[in-house]
Amino acid sequence: MKYKVCILAAGIGSRMKPFTEHINKSLLPVNFKAVISHIIEKFDTNIEIVVAVGHLKETVIDYLDCAHKDRKFTIVEVDRFTGKGSGPGYSLMQCRDHLDLPFIFFASDTLVLEDIPPPAENWLGVSPVIETEEYCTAKI
């Protein structure tokens, strides 16, 4: 099945301050590599990756151009990445015109250690959290 990957890297990373005042949270290093690179490298080079950018967007775009020259990226500039009405849902909606295939969604501050298989069908993964006001929520 052909699919895409969508990475949201638009937010200000408020829970990671002061580290994110001058660097986008997707570029924070983990084991000497930017978080976003850990995500990108989970997928074959022929998979198109849609990246939503906002906060310090130029640094993310420049990094992707330098670190992942062999990849095809579609960059979506999110116009509202802080304040009322912003958030992952809004950023994902800004990407919708570029998500014309099944896709795997990643928040740019999420690391997954396991290999990620291509999607064979539609599914949604969620996880319970205690402090729901700090995260995106889904009512099931």
What function would you assign to each model-found segment?
Residues A9, V53, A107, S127:
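Short beta-strand/turn micro-motifs composed of small residues
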Residues L113-I140:
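Conserved core of the sugar-phosphate nucleotidyltransferase
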Residues M1-I7, R15, P29, K33-P102:
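Conserved N-terminal catalytic core of the sugar/cofactor nucleotidyltransferase
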Residues G11-G13, F81, D109-L111:
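Short glycine-rich anion-binding loops that position phosphate/pyrophosphate groups of nucleotides
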